[in-house]
């Protein structure tokens, strides 16, 4: 339950005006407003940029209110984002920017559009939610996603050339400094459940807790379909059939037909068959629900890859940017093969996304959990290297995580989490999963090393809890990234696992590795880590809300 007594202004006052701040060396040239702004900014990652963003407030003698400082920092970020949008709109004209990889410029434009949209939503959440911890958690999720968008875009621009490139990089750096400052100033979400009394409810369906954006007729469908999609009324859905017996023969046609910015669930029943298409669900296609006939008969397949010139981001067979996306009983695969390197089957950069009883199959970089809050229940996920990666806040429950045999000379590694700052509310949590090897890998496990994860970025965060770990996982458990950075800043944790690969006596001795206790593990449950009690009940999918 949200803490109604939570007050942003009060907490920020405590955060920034402690006795240590009052002892901050007095500077005669600063008026009281400047002193307050300096105290606020010195706690941010980029104090100079922060102070610059507050100059207007100081110059017109706005009362030194921490909430107003935070909103002004966000307004500055939004203003700088507008300038960056203008630069991006002219990119690619007259060869002022030449892509090194197909889709990298469009990636930037799309991701920055998402950032700008969610900056506005963050401001609204903070203005309206000073007493609502859940709205503040939403704002933190939005800003964490924005920082992930920056990293993805700059990675794509690395291989680009042209006179506009340095201007774009500078504009990105300026804009996202203010976003980073805003995120650091927002208080972290306080625990909504007492771990000592909350317990765990197995197979929980909180069907009474529907968010405002789920309409009543969707309540009825989701409740009726909780034990099987076959109980819904086909007249209330769009039907896709590869054999021509539906409303559409491709999934893309159904997505295009679906209304934009829908507050209703848009139900798309995908009949059994093979759908060879790259599907993009853009930000304005909200609340799309894909329902298959079963992951053994309904297939979405594609073969884009980095090896063929695509960006990792653009290589996805199914790409989801629309909030509220759900899928069940479907197989999503990328058939490019291990020799094509990064080749994504599913990419998700949208909030409140959940998948149930799906299969996600590929080799390197199978599942790109890019950003926002995501949930996967009873899914089978296959791959070789970094096959669950990205910077979402994501929980996997009851999933089979299956490592496949890589190319000769390679090792297998399941996760590559890319949290870039300690302020980001992101990470990978696996609970009650089974970590397994395919038959050919298992038979070669004495020759091929296999690991639970490695740190893609400095503050990488991954935990494995209450899960079965088979013996193919190396005793060290975790692998370094090239060069061995981030070993003291990452957070890798294990809690109450079982199976022959779960023994921790030979685990890495890095400062960032933890054998977790109950309370630490509780922080990575669906309720705490992805605010699951606020939205998972609307999906009809089962979930466990504790340890």
From Swiss-Prot:
Annotated spans, Pectinesterase 12: 237-533
Catalysed reaction equations from the record: [(1->4)-alpha-D-galacturonosyl methyl ester](n) + n H2O = [(1->4)-alpha-D-galacturonosyl](n) + n methanol + n H(+)
Pathway field: Glycan metabolism; pectin degradation; 2-dehydro-3-deoxy-D-gluconate from pectin: step 1/5
Gene3D superfamilies: Invertase/pectin methylesterase inhibitor family protein (1.20.140.40), Single-stranded right-handed beta-helix, Pectin lyase-like (2.160.20.10)
Signal sequence region: 1-23
Record keywords: Aspartyl esterase, Cell wall, Cell wall biogenesis/degradation, Disulfide bond, Glycoprotein, Hydrolase, Secreted, Signal
Locations listed in the record: Secreted, Cell wall
NCBIfam families hit by this protein: PME_inhib
Name under which the protein is recorded: Probable pectinesterase/pectinesterase inhibitor 12
Gene: PME12
């Amino acid at each position: 339950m949200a803490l109604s007594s939570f007050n942003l202004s009060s907490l920020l006052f405590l955060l920034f005006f402690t006795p240590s701040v009052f002892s901050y060396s007095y500077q005669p040239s600063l008026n009281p407003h400047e002193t307050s702004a300096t105290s606020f900014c010195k706690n941010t990652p980029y104090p100079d940029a922060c102070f610059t963003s507050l100059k207007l407030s100081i110059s017109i003698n706005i009362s030194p209110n921490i909430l107003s400082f935070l909103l002004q920092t966000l307004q500055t970020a939004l203003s700088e984002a507008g300038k960056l949008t203008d630069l991006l709109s002219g990119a690619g004209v007259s060869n002022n920017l030449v892509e090194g990889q197909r889709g990298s410029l469009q990636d930037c434009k799309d991701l920055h559009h998402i950032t700008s949209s969610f900056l506005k939503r963050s401001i609204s959440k903070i203005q309206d939610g000073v007493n609502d911890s859940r709205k503040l958690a939403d704002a933190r999720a939005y800003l964490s996603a924005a920082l992930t968008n920056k990293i993805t875009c700059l990675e794509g621009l690395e291989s680009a050339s042209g006179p506009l490139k340095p201007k774009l990089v500078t504009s990105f750096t300026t804009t996202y400094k203010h976003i980073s400052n805003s995120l650091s100033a927002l208080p972290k979400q306080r625990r909504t459940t007492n771990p000592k009394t909350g317990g765990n409810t197995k197979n929980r369906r909180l069907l009474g807790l529907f968010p405002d954006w789920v309409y009543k007729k969707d309540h009825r469908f989701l409740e009726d379909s909780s034990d099987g999609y076959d109980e819904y009324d086909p007249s209330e859905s769009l039907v896709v059939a590869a054999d021509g017996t539906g409303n559409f023969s491709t999934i893309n046609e159904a997505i295009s037909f679906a209304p934009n910015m829908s507050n209703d669930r848009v139900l798309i029943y995908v009949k059994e068959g093979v759908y060879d298409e790259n599907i993009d669900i853009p930000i304005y296609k909200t609340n799309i629900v894909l329902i298959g006939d079963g992951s053994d008969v309904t297939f979405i397949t594609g073969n884009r890859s980095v090896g063929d010139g695509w960006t990792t981001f653009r290589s996805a067979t199914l790409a989801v940017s629309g909030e509220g996306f759900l899928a069940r009983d479907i197989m999503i695969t990328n058939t490019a093969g291990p020799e094509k390197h990064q080749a994504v089957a599913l990419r998700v950069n949208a909030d409140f996304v959940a998948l149930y009883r799906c299969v996600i199959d590929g080799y390197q970089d199978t599942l790109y959990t890019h950003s926002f809050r995501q949930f996967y229940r009873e899914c089978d996920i296959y791959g070789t290297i970094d096959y669950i990666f990205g910077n979402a806040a994501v929980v996997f429950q009851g999933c089979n995580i299956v490592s496949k045999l890589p190319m000769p000379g390679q090792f297998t590694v399941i996760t590559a989490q890319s949290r870039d700052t300690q302020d980001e509310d992101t990470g990978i949590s696996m609970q009650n999963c089974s970590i397994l090897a395919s038959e050919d890998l298992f038979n070669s496990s004495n020759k091929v090393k296999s690991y639970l994860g490695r740190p893609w970025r400095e503050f990488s965060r991954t935990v494995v809890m209450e899960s079965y770990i088979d013996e193919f996982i190396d005793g060290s458990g975790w692998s370094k990234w090239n060069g061995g950075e981030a070993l003291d800043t990452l957070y890798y944790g294990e809690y109450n696992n079982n199976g022959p690969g779960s023994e921790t006596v030979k685990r890495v001795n890095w400062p960032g590795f933890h054998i977790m206790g109950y309370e630490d593990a509780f922080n990575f449950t669906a309720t705490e880590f992805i605010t699951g009690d606020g939205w998972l009940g609307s999906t009809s999918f089962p979930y466990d809300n504790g340890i």
